[in-house]
Amino acid sequence: MKQVQLKSRAKINLSLDVLGRRSDGYHEVEMIMQQIDLYDLITLEERKDSEIRISTQCEFIPTNEDNIAYRAAEIIRENSGINRGVNIYIDKRIPVAAGLAGGSSNAAAVLEGLNHMWRLRLTPKQLMDLGVKLGADVPFCILGGAAIARGIGEILTPIEGLKNVWMVIAKPAISVSTAEVYRQLDLSKLDSRPNTDEVIQAVKEGDLYTLAGKMHNVLESVTQRNHPIIREMKRKMLEYNAIGAMMSGSGPTVFGIYKNYGRAKSAYENLSILYKQTHLVQSYSRRKWDE
C-alpha cells in the first residue's frame, strides 16, 4: 500500500501590515513570512476505497470535512478527476489556533503528498493555485522558506530568509479569533507601521539587532488590548535576553529572537515554566523544491 510522510512546518511573521479593507471583505496585507523548524508530521496512506479518513492524537482538531487537510484531499481529487481514498494521520506538534499556520501547513502537506503519491505531476504554481482556495496561508506553506506576502497573503515574492536563527515561541492558554481581530482593527488609529523594505534588508543581512528594532505587527494593537498577557509575554522574552519579541499573525503566539543557542535555551527553560506551550526552534529558509 502506498504511503508518504511529510513534515508540515509552522511559520511566523517578521512583520505584518494591513493596508486596507477590500470590497470582498478581506484585508489587503503586506507581511514577511518565515518558516521555522517546528513541524507536524503528516502520513498519507492510500485506501482501497474512496473515503478520506483523518486521525490524530490531538483532541483539539476535527477529523471530518471541517479539517482543512480533509478539504485539501477533496480539492486535489476534484481537480485531477480521480476518486481514490486516503488515510491522513496528523502527528500534531504545532500549537493549534496559534497564528503559526499549523492548519494551512497541514493542507499544503496533503496537496504535496497526494501530488507525489498519485503521480499527478502538478507544478508548485498549480499546487499554490489550489491552496489559495483553502486559505490565504496555504500557498506560502507550499512555497516554504521566507517570502513577502501581499494581496490577502497569496501573492508571494521569495526572499532570503533568516538562516538558522534561534528563537523561542510561546502560546498562552487563550484563544483568538482572527476574524474578530481584523474586525476590531482601526487603521486610522495605528501609532506605527512596519517599513517592510527595511525589515527585508535586515533579514537579508542577518542583522538581528536592526531586525529587532524594525519588525512590527499592526494586529498586536488589537490582540494586546484584548489580552494583556501578550504584552507581558513580550516583556518576559526580553527579560530573558531576547534581542526582539513580537506576536505572530493575529496571535496569540509570541516569539523571541536570540543571539545564540545558549541564550535561547536558557530563555526556553525559564519560559516553559510560565507557559505550557513553549518551544525552542530555529528559522528554516529552504524552499520545498530546493530540498
From Swiss-Prot:
SUPFAM superfamilies, alphabetized: GHMP Kinase, C-terminal domain, Ribosomal protein S5 domain 2-like
Gene Ontology process terms (BP): isopentenyl diphosphate biosynthetic process, methylerythritol 4-phosphate pathway; terpenoid biosynthetic process
Pathway(s) of this molecule: Isoprenoid biosynthesis; isopentenyl diphosphate biosynthesis via DXP pathway; isopentenyl diphosphate from 1-deoxy-D-xylulose 5-phosphate: step 3/6
Protein name: 4-diphosphocytidyl-2-C-methyl-D-erythritol kinase
Record-annotated active site: 11, 137
Keyword Hydrolase: no
Designated gene of the protein: ispE
Functional summary from the UniProt entry: Catalyzes the phosphorylation of the position 2 hydroxy group of 4-diphosphocytidyl-2C-methyl-D-erythritol.
A Pfam family per the record: GHMP_kinases_N
Membership in a protein family: Belongs to the GHMP kinase family. IspE subfamily.
GO molecular function: 4-(cytidine 5'-diphospho)-2-C-methyl-D-erythritol kinase activity; ATP binding
Keywords tagged on the record: ATP-binding, Isoprene biosynthesis, Kinase, Nucleotide-binding, Transferase
UniProt key word Nucleotide-binding: yes
Catalyzed chemical reaction(s): 4-CDP-2-C-methyl-D-erythritol + ATP = 4-CDP-2-C-methyl-D-erythritol 2-phosphate + ADP + H(+)
Catalytic activity, EC: 2.7.1.148
Top-level taxon of origin: Bacteria
List of residues binding ATP: 95-105
